[in-house]
């Protein structure tokens, strides 16, 4: 009866849903909880002893522990003694209560319920199970799984990350399962991947040939388990305590000088943020082309490695792969520069994103003119693939070349600051003009067309950019030379391929190639001065006008506008430019002066400095442009010797000090001092002498009006003594009046008035009394 009384509590808290066991085993993502789901058949057919069950269970969990253990095993030794005692008591209870597991399982099979808190239970006897599991061999894992699942018991609720499930029975006491999170530490490690690599066929559903499904299922499992466990973590004290101990151990390691992994490194924070726990997803981009890296990733995944070491190892593999790929592309492009591209020859056409990444890496690891040659060749190969499209659309011969070249070159130069000028110059109009016929290129710098597009070549723009960055000249000059050679070679080959190109154009390109090589041999120092243009203002005007163009215009409309502009420029050239027989005085308008002193030059010098460009069979536009640069160089050298720069007031000194000049200077100084003394003395005398007569004059001036006033006063007649008589009469009257007052008679009216006043006073007093009462 004791068992029957306790049945409802066990069935309510049972963590197993027996109807879902087979469905969960067929899922591709094999969760750790599936190890501890108990089937009905295994519970009824089990006949092993409790000790063998405990050993098989510990063997299974030891195998899981070996697969999932990270190098923070010091954490296990730092557990408190109270937990060890509790684990021993729980182990003794487990041996007594395992006898009732079959009855409880039979009852639970009738009332199947699903435990929502199965993933946060904790087993305090994990250490005793671990010690017993060491006695059994590892090979007993597949056979002991069915028996070990019977003895898994349920225990009180204690929060943890990845628990294993047990059933409870008997006296009603609950036994907590073992938590793998206590073995693994505070770090959340992906259990699905590592377990699937070590388990045998009864346990693993996925095969080794499905690494992508593994990674997807792994990410799904990590998200679900982390979302469930994080809901109960705030109230738990276990993980926080383990974390503090782990940090304490790492601090001790740091004090001893031992290497310790950084717990707050960028890699771990990134993995926590994205939910990635293993190296499998890092090796995914390489898996597309190199299948050997998958095996290397599996081998490295079996060993416990520091995440930083894994990161560096993967970075080294990627670097080696990029170098191998760049060498392969370089060999393919050098063997057949006009053949198919290296991406299409392999039979596999990778996506656009890895191609961008590869070219960007190639620019990082392979600096210098060699990488530039390979990139230009890749561009040319990409354009060669579009030749059938050119044959189908003869009216649009440059559109597809524009799209291919801009994609490759713009992505190849994003990470290098020294090639920022190339990035600015690689707009569609310019790249399309690189492969246009020669007469179109010859109109780029001469005229500003009405549609205001940006007619500047890559070499010219980079040379102008070198004026602002003279520190990087030595490195970028090689880049300019290689670019100019590449453009000339492309022009030469395209003029051979285009039958519509005239003989004049091909001759001019060949002359360019010959003269460029001879000038590089004869004049190596000319390159730096060539970059200093005086027509930079014109180039910047074209640049600003090109930026103001609306970006929404379609490439077809742009191409049609460009063709019309070239035709108009050709007509203007034929009208303005002289032929060979014409007079040499007819030239282009003068270039804007950059220095104020150049206005002092004579008209003959300014005519000499102007660029004389004529359309002839023997000379091309680029050759004539270089001639103009030479003239500009000469003019810049001469402009430094003009009168405006010279200070003609300065007199050069002799070989030593001149005594005569020093004596003359000393005499002048002495004379100046003497003259100053004389002037001072004269001024002092002049100031002291006129001060005395001034005082006398002032005294005389003040005395004169006084005397005049006295004389005038004497002339005034004296007044009569009337005032004195009045005063005497007054004095006489006052005593008589005082005597009269004593003798005056009494006035009757005054007495009447006084009596009346007294009566009125009494009346007023009576009114006051009446008013108060």
Swiss-Prot record:
Disulfide partners: none
Listed Pfam families: JHY
Transmembrane feature ranges: none
InterPro entries, A to Z: JHY
Disordered, as annotated region: 1-247, 325-373, 496-526, 596-615, 713-743
Biased composition, class Low complexity, residue ranges: 216-229, 598-610
Keyword Membrane: no
Basic residues bias locations: 353-369
Comp. bias (Basic and acidic residues): 29-43, 112-134, 728-743
Biased composition range(s): Polar residues: 10-28, 48-57, 145-154, 334-351, 500-516
Gene Ontology biological process terms, A to Z: axoneme assembly; brain development
UniProt key word Iron-sulfur: no
Keywords: Cilium biogenesis/degradation
Residue ranges, compositional bias (Acidic residues): 59-84
Known role: Required for the normal development of cilia in brain ependymal cells lining the ventricular surfaces.
PANTHER family: JHY PROTEIN HOMOLOG
Protein name: Jhy protein homolog
Organism: Bos taurus (Bovine)
């Amino acid at each position: 009866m004791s068992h029957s009384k306790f049945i409802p509590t066990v069935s309510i808290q049972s963590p197993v849903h027996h109807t879902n066991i087979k469905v969960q085993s067929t899922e591709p993502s094999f969760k750790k909880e599936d190890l501890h789901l108990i089937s009905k058949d295994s519970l009824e057919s089990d006949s092993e002893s409790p000790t063998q069950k405990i050993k098989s269970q510990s063997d299974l969990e030891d195998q899981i522990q070996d697969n999932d253990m990270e190098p923070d095993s010091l954490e296990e030794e730092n557990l408190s003694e109270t937990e060890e005692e509790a684990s021993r008591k729980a182990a003794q209870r487990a041996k007594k209560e395992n006898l009732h597991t079959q009855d409880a399982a039979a009852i639970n099979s009738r009332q199947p319920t699903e435990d929502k808190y199965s993933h946060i239970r904790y087993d305090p006897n994990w250490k005793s199970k671990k010690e017993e599991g060491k006695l059994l061999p590892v090979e007993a894992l597949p056979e002991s799984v069915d028996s070990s699942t019977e003895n898994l018991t349920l225990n009180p609720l204690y929060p943890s990350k990845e628990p294993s499930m047990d059933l409870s029975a008997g006296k009603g006491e609950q036994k907590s399962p073992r938590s793998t999170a206590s073995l693994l530490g505070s770090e959340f490690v992906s259990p699905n991947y590592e377990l699937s690599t070590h388990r045998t066929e009864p346990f693993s559903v996925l095969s080794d040939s499905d690494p992508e499904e593994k990674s997807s299922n792994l990410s799904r499992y990590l998200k679900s388990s982390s979302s469930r466990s994080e809901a109960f973590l705030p109230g738990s004290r276990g993980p926080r305590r383990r974390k503090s101990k782990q940090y304490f151990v790492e601090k001790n390691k740091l004090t001893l000088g031992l290497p310790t992994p950084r717990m707050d490194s960028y890699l771990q924070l990134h993995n926590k943020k994205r939910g990635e726990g293993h190296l499998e997803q890092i090796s995914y981009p390489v898996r597309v082309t190199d299948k050997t890296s998958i095996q290397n990733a599996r081998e490295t995944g079996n060993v416990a490695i520091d995440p930083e070491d894994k990161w560096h190892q993967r970075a080294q593999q990627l670097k080696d792969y990029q170098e191998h790929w760049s060498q392969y592309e370089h060999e393919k492009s050098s063997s057949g520069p006009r053949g198919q591209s290296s991406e299409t020859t392999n039979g596999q056409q990778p996506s656009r994103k890895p191609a961008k990444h590869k070219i960007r890496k190639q620019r990082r690891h392979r600096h210098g003119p060699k990488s530039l040659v390979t990139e230009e060749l890749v561009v040319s190969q990409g354009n060669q693939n579009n030749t059938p499209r050119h044959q189908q659309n003869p009216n649009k011969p440059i559109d597809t070349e524009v799209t291919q070249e801009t994609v490759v070159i713009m992505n190849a130069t994003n990470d290098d600051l020294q090639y920022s000028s190339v990035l600015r110059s690689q707009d569609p109009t310019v790249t399309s003009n690189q492969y246009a016929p020669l007469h179109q290129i010859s109109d780029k710098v001469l005229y500003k067309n009405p549609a205001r597009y940006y007619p500047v070549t890559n070499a010219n723009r980079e040379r102008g950019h070198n004026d602002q960055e003279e520190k990087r000249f030595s490195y970028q000059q090689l880049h300019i030379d290689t670019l100019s050679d590449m453009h000339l070679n492309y022009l030469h080959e395209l003029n051979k391929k285009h039958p519509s190109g005239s003989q004049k154009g091909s001759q001019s390109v060949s002359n360019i190639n010959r003269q460029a090589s001879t000038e590089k041999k004869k004049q190596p120092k000319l390159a730096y001065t060539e970059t200093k243009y005086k027509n930079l203002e014109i180039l910047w005007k074209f640049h600003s006008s090109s930026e103001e163009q609306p970006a929404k215009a379609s490439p077809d409309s742009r191409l049609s506008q460009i063709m019309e502009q070239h035709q108009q420029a050709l007509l203007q050239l034929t009208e303005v430019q002289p032929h060979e027989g014409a007079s040499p005085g007819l030239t282009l308008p003068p270039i804007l002066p950059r220095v104020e002193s150049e206005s002092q030059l004579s008209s003959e010098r300014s005519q000499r400095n102007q660029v004389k460009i004529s359309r002839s069979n023997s000379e091309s536009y680029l050759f004539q442009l270089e001639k103009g640069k030479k003239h500009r160089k000469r003019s810049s050298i001469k402009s430094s010797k003009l009168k405006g720069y010279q200070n003609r007031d300065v007199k050069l000194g002799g070989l030593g000090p001149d005594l005569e000049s020093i004596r003359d200077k000393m005499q002048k100084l002495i004379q100046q001092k003497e003259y100053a003394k004389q002037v001072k003395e004269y001024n002092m005398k002049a100031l002291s002498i006129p001060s005395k007569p001034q005082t006398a004059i002032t005294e005389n001036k003040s005395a004169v009006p006084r005397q005049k006033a006295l004389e005038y006063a004497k002339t005034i007649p004296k007044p009569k003594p009337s005032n004195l008589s009045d005063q005497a009469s007054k004095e006489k009257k006052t005593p008589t009046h005082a005597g009269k007052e004593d003798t005056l008679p009494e006035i009757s009216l005054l007495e009447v008035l006084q009596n009346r006043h007294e009566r009125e006073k009494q009346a007023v007093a009576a009114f006051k009394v009446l008013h108060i009462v």
